[in-house]
C-alpha cells in the first residue's frame, strides 16, 4: 500500500472538501486578479475602448458613396487644384507645384548653392587626382596645355588607326614641324618601345629624345633638345637599347669641309652678279629702259627679253648657291681683338 493512499484514507470527507475549496479559491483569485490588472493597464494606457464602436463618431467618418460627391461627402470639383502643406515652411502649396517648391525649400534643387558647392568640390577632387597621376616628364606636352576635356576627345580620336588626322604632321608649340622620318610618331602621347622593331627603334633614337617615362612607360618623342630630360638620361637609354658602343647623336650635324666652302659660294655669287641691277629699284629700272629706248631708237624687245632671262638665271643660281651655303653650319668666327680705349692711355 502506497504512502499517498494511506494519508488520504486516514482523512474523513469533511477535511477533503475543505482542502478542495481552498485550492479552488486560490485559482479563482489568481484569474480574477489577472483580469483586473489587464483592464487597469488598458485604461491607464488609453487603449481599453479601442475595440468599442461609437455610433456618432462612425457617422462622422462614414464613407459616402453618392453621385457628385467624394468619399467625404463634399461636392467634387475637378477644376479645383489640390493643396499640400510644405513640411519645411508650413505653407499650403498647390499639388502641381509641390515637388519644385520642396526641392527649392529643402535646398535640393538644380540651382541651389549646396549643389553648386558639391560640384565645385567634386571638380577639385578630380583635378587633384588627374594631377597626381600625370607624369612629371610630360608636363609641357600639347595635350596638357589644351585642357582635360579636349584631352579625352583627342585620345579617343587617336585610338582610331584609320583616322586621317594621324597621318598629318603635328605642329609643336614653338612652331617646328614634326619629323619627316619614314617612322612618324605622335609627339603628344609618346610611343611604347615594346611595339617597335630594331630599325624603328634605331631611327627613333637617332632623331628624337627617347627617354622612357617612369609612369607611362612610353618613350619621349621630342627632339634631342628636349628640356625635360638630360643628356645622361638619353645616353643611358641608348646604351640600354643599342649596346655600350652607342653614342648620343649631335643636335646639329655639320657637313664635311671638303663638300662645300663658304668662300666658294661668295666667289660664285660675286661672279654672277649683274652690273648695277641689284641696286636699282623697279621704278629706276623702268625709267632707264625708256631713256635708252628714246636715246638710241633701237628695238628693245629682244634686248629686254635677253636681260630678263639673264636676270632670272642669275637669281636662280644665286638662290641655289645661298641654299647650299645655308645647309652648312657656319664656322665660328674668331673673337674680335679688344678695341683700345682712352683708359689704356691713362693707365
From Swiss-Prot:
One of its GO terms (biological process) is regulation of DNA repair. One of its GO terms (cellular component) is DUBm complex. A zinc finger (SGF11-type) spans 84-105. The long N-terminal helix forms part of the 'assembly lobe' of the SAGA deubiquitination module. The C-terminal SGF11-type zinc-finger domain together with the C-terminal catalytic domain of USP22 forms the 'catalytic lobe' of the SAGA deubiquitination module. It comes from the Eukaryota. The keyword Disulfide bond does not apply. Residues 196-263 form the SCA7 domain. Residues 116-184, 275-347 are annotated as: Disordered. InterPro entries: SAGA_su_Sgf11 (IPR013246), SCA7_dom (IPR013243), SGF11 (IPR051078). It comes from Homo sapiens. One of its GO terms (molecular function) is transcription coactivator activity. Belongs to the SGF11 family. Keywords: Activator, Chromatin regulator, Metal-binding, Nucleus, Phosphoprotein, Transcription, Transcription regulation, Zinc, Zinc-finger. Gene3D superfamilies: 6.10.140.1270, Classic Zinc Finger (3.30.160.60). The modification Phosphoserine is found at residues 129, 131, 278, 281, 326. PROSITE patterns: SCA7. HAMAP family: Sgf11. Residues 132-141 have a biased composition (Acidic residues). Component of the transcription regulatory histone acetylation (HAT) complex SAGA, a multiprotein complex that activates transcription by remodeling chromatin and mediating histone acetylation and deubiquitination. Within the SAGA complex, participates in a subcomplex that specifically deubiquitinates both histones H2A and H2B. The SAGA complex is recruited to specific gene promoters by activators such as MYC, where it is required for transcription. Required for nuclear receptor-mediated transactivation. Within the complex, it is required to recruit USP22 and ENY2 into the SAGA complex. It is found in: Nucleus. PANTHER family: ATAXIN-7-LIKE PROTEIN 3. This is Ataxin-7-like protein 3.
Amino acid at each position: 500500500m502506497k504512502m499517498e493512499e494511506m494519508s488520504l484514507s486516514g482523512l474523513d470527507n469533511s477535511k477533503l472538501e475543505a482542502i478542495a475549496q481552498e485550492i479552488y479559491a486560490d485559482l479563482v483569485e489568481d484569474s480574477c486578479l489577472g483580469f483586473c490588472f489587464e483592464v487597469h493597464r488598458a485604461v491607464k494606457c488609453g487603449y481599453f475602448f479601442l475595440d468599442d464602436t461609437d455610433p456618432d463618431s462612425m457617422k462622422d467618418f462614414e464613407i459616402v458613396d453618392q453621385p457628385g460627391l467624394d468619399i467625404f461627402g463634399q461636392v467634387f470639383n475637378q477644376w479645383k487644384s489640390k493643396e499640400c502643406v510644405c513640411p519645411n515652411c508650413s505653407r499650403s502649396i498647390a499639388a502641381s507645384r509641390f515637388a519644385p517648391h520642396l526641392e527649392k525649400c529643402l535646398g535640393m534643387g538644380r540651382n541651389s548653392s549646396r549643389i553648386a558647392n558639391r560640384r565645385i568640390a567634386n571638380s577639385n577632387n578630380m583635378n587633384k587626382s588627374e594631377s597626381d597621376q600625370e607624369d612629371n616628364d610630360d608636363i609641357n606636352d600639347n595635350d596638357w596645355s589644351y585642357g582635360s576635356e579636349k584631352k579625352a576627345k583627342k585620345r579617343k580620336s587617336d585610338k582610331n588607326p584609320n583616322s586621317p588626322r594621324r597621318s598629318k604632321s603635328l605642329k609643336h608649340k614653338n612652331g617646328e614641324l614634326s619629323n619627316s622620318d619614314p617612322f612618324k610618331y605622335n609627339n603628344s602621347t609618346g610611343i611604347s618601345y615594346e611595339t617597335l622593331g630594331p630599325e624603328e627603334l634605331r631611327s627613333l633614337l637617332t632623331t628624337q629624345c627617347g627617354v622612357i617615362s617612369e609612369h607611362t612607360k612610353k618613350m619621349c618623342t621630342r627632339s634631342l633638345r628636349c628640356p625635360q630630360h638630360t643628356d645622361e638620361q638619353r645616353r643611358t637609354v641608348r646604351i640600354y637599347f643599342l649596346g655600350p658602343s652607342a653614342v648620343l647623336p649631335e643636335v646639329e650635324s655639320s657637313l664635311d669641309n671638303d663638300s662645300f666652302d663658304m668662300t666658294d659660294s661668295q666667289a660664285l655669287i660675286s661672279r654672277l652678279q649683274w652690273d648695277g641691277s641689284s641696286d636699282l629699284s623697279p621704278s629706276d629700272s623702268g625709267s632707264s629702259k625708256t631713256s635708252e629706248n628714246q636715246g638710241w631708237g633701237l628695238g628693245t624687245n629682244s634686248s629686254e627679253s635677253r636681260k630678263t632671262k639673264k636676270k632670272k638665271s642669275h637669281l636662280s643660281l644665286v638662290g641655289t648657291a645661298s641654299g647650299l651655303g645655308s645647309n652648312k653650319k657656319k664656322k665660328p668666327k674668331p673673337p674680335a681683338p679688344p678695341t683700345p680705349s682712352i683708359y689704356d692711355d691713362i693707365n
